[in-house]
Amino acid sequence: MKTVSVIIPAHNAAATIAGTLASLRSEAAVIGEVLLVDDASSDDTAAVAEEAASRLALPLRVIASNCRDAGGARNLALAQADCPWIYMIDADDLHLEGGLRSLLSRSDAQPRAEMVVGAFRRRTKGEHHQFKLPYGYTVTGIANASAYLEGQVRSIAVGSALVSRRAIGETRFPTALAYDEDTLFWARLMCRAPLAVITQPVMTYFVSAERSDDRFTIKPAQRFLAWRHALRQLTDCGIAKSTLKTREGLVALKIARVHYARGDFDTAARFLAVAKAAPKVPSDIWRCMRYQLKLAVRRRFSISHALLQSA
């Protein structure tokens, strides 16, 4: 049965979308529709996708969008999806043969599960990294969402999870956030959707470390405050405020590390102070101490260098 709606947000993805669609060809027997949200592309994304889908016999429908936001683009498709199961993948990632059918098989074997998570692999600069296996999840409940936000379980890559449309309901991705919008979406779902995992690899996703880090350097304070506001709305799911504070600290530490690496020590220090004030596990306490020491050393070196230059 064709039971899956595949959702692909795409912005200027003409160079990669045909490969993404080709990677889904082996799952054609279970795919009822592919909803490609062409989000303000200025290239031939839609035309390339339509040609590839016709050649691959995939049931593609293009949705024109001007969201300029991956979360918003996914939301448009979620509102129009017709199949009982939803699978989302980005327009530069690759599905692995048999992954979608394995996710569906686990949902059949564990009928209460409305969210099935598989393994994934990262690809950076052409290098394939070791598969990341899902671990630490319980069957259902807020415990999953809390552990996810606190970094105690494996993160879910978009493209490694299958979710029932019934479980999603009216849940949508937060929009206009520079980062972590998928984490907030998964957390909401995990609060109520019974979950199952498989160890089979489902997809490979491309990571640009530079592009990922850039998200934290543009208007860092403004973007962090917008993200924190969206994060704190998760209290309406019953998630404890202490868990949300822990997440704040994890993200603040990541931002501090990026600014430290790029030589912006003042911004790094400000975000490190936020990270230090948040509840954390011992390993993160050590990371904060280590970066505090490194900042002190680099600042002292910079002052000494400036004095020598002016002498």
Predicted feature locations:
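Conserved nucleotide-sugar donor-binding catalytic segment
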Residues: 139-219
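Flexible acidic/His/Gly-enriched loops in nucleotide-sugar-dependent glycosyltransferase catalytic domains
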Residues: 100-167
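Short, well-formed alpha-helical segments that are part of the catalytic scaffolds
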Residues: 13-26
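Short aromatic/hydrophobic "clamp" motif used to bind/position activated sugar donors
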Residues: 86
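A conserved acidic beta->alpha catalytic loop
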Residues: 23, 38-48, 67, 90, ...
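Catalytic core of nucleotide-sugar-dependent glycosyltransferases
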Residues: 201-209, 214-242, 265-278
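Membrane-interface aromatic/basic loop that binds lipid-linked glycans or pyrophosphate carriers
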Residues: 260-311
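Glycine-rich, basic loop-to-helix element that forms the pyrophosphate-binding segment
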Residues: 65-81
